[in-house]
Amino acid sequence: MRVVVISSFVSVSLQLSFLLLLASAIRSSSSPPNDPFLGISPQDEKYYKSSSEIKCKDGSKKFTKAQLNDDFCDCSDGTDEPGTSACPTGKFYCRNAGHSPVILFSSRVNDGICDCCDGSDEYDGHVSCQNTCWEAGKAARENLKKKIETYNQGLVIRRQEIEQAKVGLEKDAAELKKLKSEQKILKGLVDQLKDRKEQIEKVEEKERLQKEKEEKEKKEAELAAQQGKGDAEEKTDDSEKVEESSHDEGTPAVSQHDETTHHDEIGNYKDYPSDEEPAAEGEPTSILDEATHTNPADEHVVERKEESTSSEDSSSPTDESQNDGSAEKEESDEVKKVEDFVTEKKEELSKEELGRLVASRWTGEKSDKPTEADDIPKADDQENHEHTPITAHEADEDDGFVSDGDEDTSDDGKYSDHEPEDDSYEEEYRHDSSSSYKSDADDDVDFSETTSNPTWLEKIQKTVKNILLAVNLFQTTPVDKSEADRVRKEYDESSSKLNKIQSRISSLEKKLKQDFGPEKEFYSFHGRCFESKQGKYTYKVCAYKEATQEEGYSKTRLGEWDKFENSYQFMSYTNGEKCWNGPDRSLKVKLRCGLKNELMDVDEPSRCEYAAILSTPARCLEDKLKELQQKLEKLMNQDKPQNHDEL
């Protein structure tokens, strides 16, 4: 029994000894590095060397320099163990001289795998790592040299584009100023043409209404004349019966009536109501008969007047007798003109107007209501008209309107006493009517100094001025259709030109408000689109407008232009088409230095959120070029690293 206990005790002691030896071996394999600052980045060296007591970066506790890289984790964030694998959250910095530095998790230190090209992560000697940084860095240095060359060339292009942007902006500003000036002048001309067009349309409308009125009155007069003619025929039959009866009974006929009685009856016709017309025995019973049928008594009176006039002319050679004879002859002529006018206009005048007209020729009284007989021109009046200029006030009252009746009178030549107006009067009158429509724009333009090769605006000004002079709304003839059409055509063309100018002004104003960068380096982007074909899609990015994804004939809007972001490193497009059951589409375009504008690497890293890269000379910055040159210089000045055989 005692022997068994002793043997068990010996067995346990051997196991413990083995475990202690194993722990000692493990302890020696993870021994601290010879360099206490191994694994610390150059940026953090000052933090560790500033004092003898170091504070954990998370602020939890402090540790001494002796505790730094002692292979025991004192800080939960691994601040005290950057060069060992003691802390799971620690970071190890590979310097990789001659190549690019690398940061590793501390758990990969002394794990038997060479992670750093300089072999610094396997310092315990269990693995021999060759230093391959110089060879590996050779390709990186070549790429860096190419990148520097791209920046150099791109910087030259960028400077050129900046100069072109300055010129372009100045040109845009000058064009905007010129267009605004032209807009002001052209708007004045368009306003003048619009006023004249509206005036012409008013006159045309007035003429149209007057023509409709006259046609209506003419139809009413024709209807009344037809009705009156029927009444006259009935009354004529009655009158003939009365005359036959009077002849059979020996009663004197109408021809036996005294001239004075006939004068009194007709002269006092207007004293009777229209529905109580006097009807003398043996005379016509209507005024229409008086106007349309020749009265024997009237012929007798005219013949007697002519005979008395001729006898008085022969028997009285004195001046006074001659004057009396001339006056009677003129009176006879006037009577004849009235008779002729009545014959011509009998269908257009009402019964009442015919009655007044016939009565007035005997009594010498004028009707209270003016008739067309008042328009019969007199020789003396025509002579006075030829030598009496029309005043502006009279022209305004006339309003430039001429009825169709006046047109017929002048065209038919029935009253050819009118003579053509003096040409000098027409020119003087036309000049006066044009000056009333002169605007401020006319005062600003001197057409006498127009060059032999005038601009389009000067041509328009001259054309409008000629039109305004040619179209005279106060003339005594109806509106000339060809001139009216000319005004409308010029108004339409000038209005179209004005709209184009206003559209261009709006476009320029919007353009000049855009953000073209601190040095206007993105000015050349305005109005340009960049495309990239990737798979079945074609991506199109238009600066200051929109970005789209196209497939065949379908187009998806990825976003509208928003702004530049992160110091002009990105172009942002937002508020695109909504994704099904998702957000609105958007796009961010990363800008990088390149010798030409080229869109590439379009991707969708998140649902409906797109990303792309655009190379452009606009991003070849001088500060970035200096940074790259310094980096290359540092790499080239490094000595060729030695192999870590001693490790």
UniProtKB/Swiss-Prot annotation:
One of its GO terms (cellular component) is endoplasmic reticulum. Keywords: Coiled coil, Disulfide bond, Endoplasmic reticulum, Plant defense, Signal. Residues 395-410 have a biased composition (Acidic residues). Residues 206-222, 230-268, 290-308, 326-355, 363-388 have a biased composition (Basic and acidic residues). The keyword Lipoprotein does not apply. This is Glucosidase 2 subunit beta. It is found in: Endoplasmic reticulum.
